[in-house]
Amino acid sequence: MSNSEKQTLAIEWFKNMSEIKKSRENGLVSKVIAKDVHVLSGAKKYGILWKGKEGEMIDHIAKGQNEHLYEMIDFNSPARLFFDMDFKSKDEFGFGCDIPPNQVVVMFMEELQLFVNKLIGHDSGKFNAKEVLITQCKRLDRPDKHSFHLVYPKIVFRNITQMRAFVLSFGHYLFEEKHMMSLAFQKKGKNRSLGRAVFDMSPYTRDRLFRLMGQSKMGEPYENTLRPVKIQEVYETSNNFFDNLIDDNGISSHAQIITLRYSELENISDYMVQPCSFLDMDATPPSTTLGDLIHNSVLKNYGNVPLKTYVAAKQDRRGVTITLLGNNNKTPGNLKSAKDNILPVDWHTLIKEEFRGKEINIENDEQFLEFFTARELKEADYVYYYLNFISDICHFIPDKTMLTWMNGCDDYVSTRSERKLFYAKESSSKKPITGRFALSLLENVYGVDNVNDLRNPVPKPIGDFKNVKRTVMTTEEWEPIEARDLRSRILTEQNKDLKTNNYINGAITMDFEKEEEYAKIGVPEDEEGNRIEMAQRFNSKKRAYFISGQMGASKSSGTLESIVELVMKGMMKNVLIITPRIVLAKQTILKLFTVYKELLGDSKVKRDFKKTNDIDITAMFHKAYQDKEIRQVKEWCRGRINPEMEHCNICVSLINSIHRLNRAVYDTIIFDEPITCIDNFYIELHTKNSNENAAEVVANTISRRNAIVNRLTGFTMLSNQLFFIDAAFTPDSINLCKSLYYGEYSFIVSPREWNKHMRSEGVGDTTVKNTCKRINKENLEIRKRIRIVKTRSEDKSQMIQKEEVTYKIFREPQMICVYDKSLEKPIFQKIIDYKSKNKLLNTLLETICEGQKVVVYCSTQKESERLYHAVKGWTERKMSWIPRLILITGSTVKKEPGEVVNKIKDGDVIFTTSVLGVGTSISEEGLFDCAFMICKLSVGSPLLSDMIQLSARVRATKNRVLHMNISCGQFGVDCSKLTRELHSFQPANYMYGGFMDCLDITHRNRRLFHHVCISNYTIARETMLSEITDALGHVKDATLSRISPEYIYVKDVDHRFLATRDITEQRQLAQKLDVLDCRMEHTEEFVDFVGLYKNKKEGRRVVAKINVPKKNELLHEFWQKSKIGREGYTPVTHKAYSLKRSHSTMVEHDMDDDESTNKKQELEEEDEECIDIDEYNNERF
C-alpha cells in the first residue's frame, strides 16, 4: 500500500466544505484537514481527521512524507497563540526589510515579551517569550523571502476572536505607541505608500488554513517544506537572554537559526495550533487561564481603540518610516475599503439581573432608560456606546427625564449633564434619529429574540400584498413608445438633464430656477414643515424609469444601446446591471460588447462625439470568467484601456452576487427583470417537509435576504438613476421598486399629511409628533449631501473650509410602455389546457414520433428530470431512430453557462425548468415545432414570471400553439383559518415603508394565498390562466390594446363524433382539438398508423399519420390513396398505435409496398406491447 493510500486511512476526504459545514451545524466538531490538489489555482480538498487517528498523521509527518497538508483553525474553539511571519530582504531599490531574518525574529520576541508585561503587570512571570516553537520555510527559488511560523503552546485563547484582539492590539502597540519601524517594510507596487508588518495581522478570521510542519505547497520542491528550527541564543541563554542578544545598536548580532531533526522533537503535535483534543468535547478542555488574563487586559486597555490590519509606509533616505493607517487625513487608494477592527464587547456585564432571560417589550422611548445605567456604561469603558445612546433617544424624551437619568450616576453638577445633552442634540441634528441605535444596543445585551419593538415608529404597509395581479397599462399612467424610438427617447432625456463632466463627489448636479419645477418634483421640508431655503436648492437630480411592454419588443436591447452610447460620451461614468440568471447575465455582456464595437467602428460616432471614453465591461458573479466568451470580452476591453487615462465601467452582476461589489458607487443602476429578482429572495422557503425545520429555513432565508437588501439599498441610495425593465409588472412590485428608488420612507407624502392621517385614526399627540420627527429626519438624511467647499479669505492669507448642504430632488418615475407594430399576433395564438396530464403526455409522445422539434417546460427540476428519463426509455424501446433529448438543469447552467443556448438549438426534444429564467432569448424565429408546459401548483406559485416568460422566449413556434397542464401539488390542506386571515388584510391609505418591510408583507400574504390556492384548485387555476393569457398577449398599437391568445379547455369530448365512421369528420375534429384526445375515450374504434419514410429525391425524413377505424375492411384502399402510397416513398419502419384509456399501444412492422397493399392489418391484444401512462407516471415520476 502506498503512502498516500495510508494517509487516507486517517482522513475522510470531501469534495467541498458544504458537507463539513452541515455536520458543524448539527453540533459535530472535528479536526478539518485541507490538501492542495491544483498547482496553478491553489484549489484544495477538505477532509475530517478521524477521532483517535491524530497519531497516525503525526507519524506520516515524522517520516518526512509531504502530502501538502494544512490544518483548518476552527473559529469558535480554543487555539494556541500563533504568528505567521512573512517578509523579504531589502533589495537594491530599498524595498523590503533591511534587518537579517534571525535578528527580526529575536526583536519580535523581545517586543512581544515587553507588550505582555505591560498588559498583565505582576503576572508577567506567567509568560516567557522563549517558550515558542518555530518552523521555517526556506525557498530555494526565492532566497530573499523568509517565512516563519511561531506557536506558543502554553498560551491558549478561548476562540480566534480573542486572539485577533490580542494580535491587533500588539500591532497598535508596536507601530502607534512605540513606532517600532524596524519590524515593518515597504512593499513593491504602484502605490509606494503601502507597507506591512513582518507578521501577518489578517489571518485571524473564520476557517483559515495553517500549513502543517513538514509540508509544502503543491508544485514546490521538497526543500520548501516547513522545518522545525530554533534560535540558538534564545534557547541556550538562562538569565536575561534578551540582554545577551542585543548589542549597543539595539540589534542582536549573535542569534543563529539552527534546523532541528524530527527525532529531536519531543512532541510534534505541539506545533499544531489546534490539536484534536481542543475540538473533542469528551476530552479535558485546555487551560485558558493565561489567555483569559491577557484578553481581559486587552479589553481594558484597547477596548475603544480602532485597530488596523495594515500599515502605511513612506520611503526616504534614512530608511522606512511606518505610520498606522488612518492617522493621515488622506487614505491610500488601495486601502479605502479597509475596515476598522474595534475589539468585541462583553455585553453580559451590562445585563440587569431582574431582566435576565425575560421578554422585553419597548412601547415608548423612555423605557430604554430602565435597562441601562449611565454609571455602568462609563465604568465599563463603553463611552462610545453611552454617547451614541444618548444622542439616539434624546430627541424623543423630555429633557428633564434625560437629565434625571444622567445625573443619577454623575457626581458632577447638573449643568455638566445639561451641557452633554446639548452637545448630544447638536451632534445628532445632522443624522437620521430613529431610535435604532438604542434598540440594537438593547438587542445585543439581552438578545434579539427577547426584545420586541412595539413603538411602531413608522407606519407599516398592511395592504393586500399578494403580488399576483398584473398591472393594467393605460395611457394615463404609461407613456406608449414604439420600440425603435426607445433609444432616442432615453438619449434625449439624458442630453437634456445631464451635464458632461459635471461630477460633484460622484453626483451629476443641476440647478433649478423656476419655482414651478420645484412644485412638480417636490422639495424637502424641515422639521417644522417649512420648505428648504432657496440657497440650498443646488440639488443633484435623481430619476427612475419603469420600462414595460411586449415580450420581444427589445426593451432591454434599446436600453443597453443607449447606456453604452451615454457612457462613451462621458454622461455616465459607472453603470451597474443586475440580472436574476447567469444565462441572462452572459447575454447582457455579449450585447453590450456588440454595441460597443459597433459604435467604435461607426464613423458618425467619431465625428459627433468630441471625446469617447474607453469602457471596461466586467462580470461580477461566481465562475463568470470560466466562460470563454466572457473572458474574451474582458481581455478585449482591458487591451484598449490606457491605464494613465480615465475610463468608464459597466458591471454586470447577479442579484445574489452584489456582495462581491464591495463599496463601489454607481451613478446608474439597471434592474433587468426585477420581479424575478424579488422572487428569488424567497426561493429557499419551498421545502417538502414544511413541518420540519420550517422555522430554521425561514430564518436562514430572511438572514440571507436582509444582507442582500441592505447591500442593495446602499447602492441605490448613492445612485442618480435607476432603470427597472420587466414585461410583467404588478402594482405591488412597482411599489417595491419605488421604495428602492425613494429610500426607506416615501417622499410623496409630506409630514403634515402624515400628521393629519394619523390623527384621523386616533393616534396620540406624542406618538404623532415623534413619528413625524423620525420620518423628517430619515427623509432629510437620505436627501442630504454635505460638500466641503474651500475658499480663501478676503485678504487671501488663509484657506477657509465651509460645509455646503445640498438636497437631492427625486423626480416622479417615468412609466414607459414599449410596443412593436411588427408583432401583431400574440406569441401563442392558441393555448390548449389539458385537464388530464395523461392526455398531454400522449400528445407529447406522438409529437416526438412525428419527428418534430419539441420544447417541454416543467415547473420543478424533479418533474423535468423524471419526464426526461421516462421519455428517453420510451424512445429507446419503441423508436427506430433515437431523437436527441436535452435536459437543462441548474447544474447544467452552472457548469456550462455558455453552451446552454447552443444545446437548445441542437437538440430535438428539450426538457427544462425555470432555471433558465427570464431573458433567455432564442433569436431564431420558429425554432421549435411545438411547445409544452407542465405547471404544478406549489408554494412558489402562482406567480409564473419565470415559466411564462421562458415559454415566450421561444418567440413563436411554427404552429403558435402552447399545450399546457396545471396540476395541484398538495391536497387536503385545511385553509379555512388561512382564508379568514387572508381576507383580513384590507388595503389602507398608509404609504409603503422600506423595501425590507414590503418583502416581509409580500411573503406573508403570498404564502397565505398560495395555501388557499392549493386547497381551492379553482382559484389557483383561474389566477394562473389569467396570468398566462395576459403575459402571452401582445400590445397591438399605441392605444395599448392587447391581443390575447385563444384559450381552449380540453375536457370530455362529445361522443357523437366518435360514433361515426366518417374519416373526414374525425380529421376535422382532430384539427379542431387534438387527435389523441378524441381517441382516448373509445380506443377500440381506432388504429393510428405512424410511419417514418425517407424521401429518395430530397433525402429528408417525412412523417405521415393515418387515422382509420380498426375494423374497416378498406384499410388497404385508404393506404393506396394516401400521399405516401401515391408518391412512392420507401417505408423504413411502420409502427401501429392502438390507444386505450391511459394506455398507448405500439406494434412494430417491417413493411414494403406489396405488403402494404395486399396484407390486411389485424392487431390482436396478445400481440400488443403496452405502455401504461398511469404506471409510468407513478413509477418514473
UniProtKB/Swiss-Prot annotation:
Its EC number is 2.7.7.-. Residues 1163-1181 have a biased composition (Acidic residues). The keyword Phosphoprotein does not apply. It is an enzyme of class 2 (transferase). The keyword Transferase applies. GO terms for molecular function: DNA-directed RNA polymerase activity. Pfam families: DNA_primase_S (PF01896). Synthesizes small RNA primers for the Okazaki fragments on both template strands at replication forks during viral DNA synthesis. This is Putative primase.
